[in-house]
Amino acid sequence: MKQRYAMGYLCFFLIIPLMAGDDNMARKANYQLAGRFAPYKIKKLLYSTSINPKWIEGTENFWYEWETSEGKTFYVVDPIRGKKEQIFDNDKIAAELTRISLDPWDAQHLPIEKIKFIDKNTLQFDVKSSQDDKGEEVIEEEIDEQKWDLDKKEKEKEKEKIYKKKVFHFEYKINTQKLRELKDWEAPDKHPKWANVSPDGETIVFARNHNLYMINASDYKKILDAGRGKDGKKAVDAIEKVTVNERQLTRDGEEYYSYAVFDRGDTDDKRKRDKGKRKRTRIYWAKDSKKFASIRSDQRKSKDLWVVHSVKNKRPKLETYKYDMAGDKNVTQYEIDIHDLATQSILNLDIKKFKDQRIGVYSGRQFRYPDSDKPQQTVWLAEDSKKFYFYRQSRDMHKVDVCVADTETGDVKVLFEEKLNTYVELQRLELLKSGDMLWWSERDGWGHIYHYGKNGKLKQQITSGPFSVRRIMGIDESKQTIYFMANGREENEDPYLQHLYSVFIDGTRMKLLNEGNFDHRTSMGESNRFFVNNYSLVNTLPKSALYNTSGKKMADLQEADLSQLMAAGFQYPEPFQVKSADGVTDIYGVMTKPFDFDPQKKYPIVAYVYPGPQTEAV
């Protein structure tokens, strides 16, 4: 399958027609017609085309918003009952919001923002008023970067004071349709980007001046309280003023051999101004919060690259950063340290094998609820802090070792390896409760799932055949079932179309879960019991439906509203299939004809190919 992907997917565009009978006389290009379908114009004619389900924690339910030419509507879905219902009576809620906010709203233009479910029947949301809130502090617009060279007096002139718009906070009960203004509303926690919070919430790690530091939960609460309800520079300034007890964890960090994550896009001037401030760092927590691993990059011998920022600046600003290129003798070197919080010790793992190797750490699968105020955490792939899984990859990307490290002794063991004469493509490692592992590989020419024992010995190939598994979507160990996306398996279909499948861990009972000659994109809930299926082709109306993971359709949910687009004269592209130059290989593509296409005329063709692989490596 790799060869098929490398050839890419073709898009053919028919452009300026040639008059029949005279190939040398081209008709004038119809730019006006093409301009009608410029992206910024199409955007105004398109509404919702797929459902992005917001799963509600503690339930199987989810909610979503859907926009048509009639306006925006909000729905909540109960997958167990296979029922969807409108959250609001749009006319009624518009009238109530008008009464409270004194701004005129109607059913087609609801101002509802930032919906957050508290439980399956209770949600909160915001409505922004048209009026300034004179009781709030004003926002001082951040000074553009090019203005930092001005003197203090000139800087003050550059500041613009802008009042915040008043925001109303509401709570709504779905079962009773009761709306209540939350006059005592308090802003939720807003976690700074630099904060790496442990799974138990007791330790927060960050970088400062290239080294690692930590604070405890009580000090972190002071920081959250200081930044509560504030945005941008005001939040940063308020947080910086809080006095907390920082404990330094490392002392050997330096520029280009740092524990901090280098922020691309920062100019040299901004980097100087931010020196000494808290920074993000790349760490992975153990699930029990006793240890964490840090990834450190040594770029001291790597060469510089430069970008000049000139679009937003009156004067160009320079950004200097390290960048490895093909053929460079000295490139970035990586190392992994294990930090023990109880003993304050650091264990440097001996991970060296391939010259100029790359490394990656395997993290555990986590389900993120959109309404959660919890900080995002990266937890390493293990049930405790005793083991640590990672991979190392040769510079030419032809060899990969999947390894496990003992975090007490530092011993590193190769569990299994991948070798190919072409590049080895990687996906996540899945760890079962037994300690066994699921691994995705293209070793037989197709992407498939393999089952390894905890000792690294291959037990069996789970999926096989002339099709490609794209990715594992979920694992239900209680049912010994894997859910995955794949393409190329169904006969008489474009092999690029994706479907959702299930298979037992022992390789039996593989089942297609969303039939239909369409490209399917799915979103599964945390329990792996239900999924939303968005499906279409380039020449069909996008639709969405609810399924259970036995493959039963529970409900049709939505069809996209393309009425305005079609009324403007839009026409679907046309899929096609042809043989390549070898006369054997099938090529699949899409042809887009001019909207005033005349079959009696001749048209030159523009062939657009997007070849692979899409990867950046040296």
Regions found by a protein language model. Give the residues of each.
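Bacterial N-terminal signal peptides that target proteins for export
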Residues: 1-9
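Residues at the start of alpha-helices and the adjacent loop-to-helix junctions
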Residues: 9-12, 26, 581
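Hydrophobic h-region of N-terminal signal peptides that target proteins for export
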Residues: 12-20
